[in-house]
From Swiss-Prot:
The lineage of its organism: Archaea, Methanobacteriati, Methanobacteriota, Methanomada group, Methanococci. This is 2-amino-5-formylamino-6-ribosylaminopyrimidin-4(3H)-one 5'-monophosphate deformylase. InterPro entries: Creatininase-like_sf (IPR024087), Creatininase/forma_Hydrolase (IPR003785), FAPy_deformylase (IPR024901). It comes from Methanocaldococcus infernus (strain DSM 11812 / JCM 15783 / ME). Keywords: Hydrolase, Iron, Metal-binding, Zinc. The gene is arfB. Coiled coil: none annotated.
Length: 222
């Protein structure tokens, strides 16, 4: 049997090989004109991978299914049970490569609906799970700014990236969602008042905060 050189490379210590990071977001959601439909999962993947590079933890990939509140209609989503099924497969294989603790980095608000069921997998699979969520106002300034920093936002399309053109921006035009969810309505009102823009400094600041939070959780797991 091959003996692995666990102390190789730039890592916090050898125990970090027992920690995995999984990105969770959404692959199929409209995000106006300046951001791609898979913005959430790309941001979550970037944050997850950077935290792993900084610490030596293992980036275990992404959760493909996502879920959403029934009244938020801006994409194609799945059932909570689909997420649980996919994660069960992923976590079972993670254990086979020595993973004992996992941090799930979620950048899609709707996935919070699955948090309880995800935590229940701890006992089912016998693996420690930390669920970290970084919700951002949909397709608005924060997401635009982060997207620009990581290279997925198209600045040339910002002229048309407005709520009056795309209802999902800030969820301003998603009337049912605003009526049924107070937080969504408050965010939409803020977007109506302030508009949306790309702020590179804000994007860098938020990315650093998110990455550092994941790094801290990895450190706490050691």
């Amino acid at each position: 049997m091959t003996i692995l050189r666990l102390n190789g490379g730039k890592i916090l210590n050898e125990k970090v090989h027992e920690i995995g990071v999984i990105a969770m977001g959404s692959y199929l959601e409209n995000h106006g004109s300046a951001l791609p439909i898979d913005t959430d999962i790309k941001i979550a993947s970037y944050v997850s991978l950077m935290a792993c590079i900084k610490t030596g933890a293992k980036f275990l990939g992404t959760v493909i299914p996502s879920t959403e509140y029934s009244y938020v209609k801006h994409g194609i989503h799945n059932k909570v049970s689909d997420i649980v099924e996919y994660l069960t497969f992923l976590l079972t294989w993670a254990k086979r490569i020595g993973i004992k603790k996992v941090i799930i980095v979620n950048c899609h608000g709707g996935n919070i609906l699955a948090e309880k069921e995800i935590k229940e997998l701890e006992n089912l699979i016998n693996i420690k799970i930390k669920f970290l969520s970084f919700p951002l106002t949909h397709a608005a300034t924060e997401e635009l700014s982060i997207g620009y920093v990581i290279g997925i936002a198209n600045k040339e399309k910002m002229k048309e990236h407005k709520p009056e053109n795309y209802a999902e921006i800030g969820m301003v035009g998603l009337r049912e969602a605003r009526e049924k969810n107070k937080e969504i309505d408050e965010e939409a009102k803020r977007v109506e008042k302030e508009g949306v823009k790309i702020d590179e400094e804000l994007g860098k600041k938020l990315l650093d905060e998110f990455i550092n939070k994941v790094v801290n959780e990895i450190t706490n797991f050691l």
